[in-house]
From Swiss-Prot:
PROSITE patterns: COMPLEX1_ND1_1, COMPLEX1_ND1_2. NDH-1 shuttles electrons from NADH, via FMN and iron-sulfur (Fe-S) centers, to quinones in the respiratory chain. The immediate electron acceptor for the enzyme in this species is believed to be ubiquinone. Couples the redox reaction to proton translocation (for every two electrons transferred, four hydrogen ions are translocated across the cytoplasmic membrane), and thus conserves the redox energy in a proton gradient. This subunit may bind ubiquinone. The lineage of its organism: Bacteria, Pseudomonadati, Pseudomonadota, Betaproteobacteria, Burkholderiales. This is NADH-quinone oxidoreductase subunit H. HAMAP family: NDH1_NuoH. The chain crosses the membrane at residues 20-40, 92-112, 127-147, 165-185, 203-223, 259-279, 294-314, 329-349. Signal peptide: none annotated. It is found in: Cell inner membrane. Its EC number is 7.1.1.-. Keywords: Cell inner membrane, Cell membrane, Membrane, NAD, Quinone, Translocase, Transmembrane, Transmembrane helix, Ubiquinone. It is a multi-pass membrane protein. NDH-1 is composed of 14 different subunits. Subunits NuoA, H, J, K, L, M, N constitute the membrane sector of the complex. GO terms for biological process: aerobic respiration.
Amino acid sequence: MDQLLASVHAAGHSFLGDYWLLVWTLVKIVAVVLPLMGCVAYLTLWERKVIGWMHVRHGPNRTGPAGLLQPIADALKLLLKEIVVPAKSSKALFVIAPIMTIMPALAAWAVIPFGPEAALANVNAGLLFVMAITSLEVYGVIVAGWASNSKYAFLGAMRASAQMISYEIAMGFVLVIVLMVSGSLNLSEIVMLQTSGRFADMGLTFLSWNWLPLLPMFVIYIISGTAELNRHPFDVVEGESEIVAGHMVEYSGMSFAMFFLAEYANMILISMMATLMFLGGWSSPIDAMPFTWIPGWIWLGIKTLFVVTLFIWFRASFPRYRYDQIMRLGWKVFIPLTLVYLLIVAIWMKTPWNIWH
């Protein structure tokens, strides 16, 4: 693979000269964004199918064989719908808000590695970049609520901003703990460090992943990610019985679709981050045949699908929490727990039983 890429680089540079770097960057962006959009589209089908199975029904099965064309039909429906801009809205901000939401969701994928050297930009501060860029999405939500000139949209935006900022703190402390045990902000190095240790030497690589010693942090990261996404059971932002669709209530057509795409792209992103930080990324769970025959990117996809399915399971199983319960969980439970575990890990790493170094 490295030789193939080197030959492609040489041929491209000989044909295009200094423009090759720009062309190659655009090719890599398209190679990441297009499959991501496909995954987002079919994640909606997977979600509806899984919830259908949990409810003992079939789910979508009419559009195409086994309902496989349902995401395409949904996309066409949204494309053909009229984009209605409310008469009393701040029109420029109303149009910009969905773009402000989806752009960080796509930009964060620039540093996500799909293999040891397979990343759009393999930067040393990848963990910090993801945390910083995803925190910008709250601005799109606030702008959407303000620009809509609707009390429902504004109330939903205020709820969303408070909830997202609150749970970002807990997620940030979890990332600090992962940084402590890994000694690196580079996502590829974090994965590689999980493939070494006593259990990995025995071939039981899955016992050397961070999920085992950092299990409470793994659970907090998944639950905080659910709240960060404003998904069920933390979806008071768009509680249908209270404020209809929250900050998205005045949006239609592709404007609404951008919020929708941002939510599902972020769900895949948080699942991928959980896989890279806690589940060994692209490493196989057991270092023996036939597990080692499976390519690393397939293992990465399987683990990410597992975490994504957890989000869907939460939606199908739990009732919606009240807003005060959500805030209490974030500030009085998760943030103190992450701080205490941060101290425990710091002390653990100074003892002879340090398992990370």
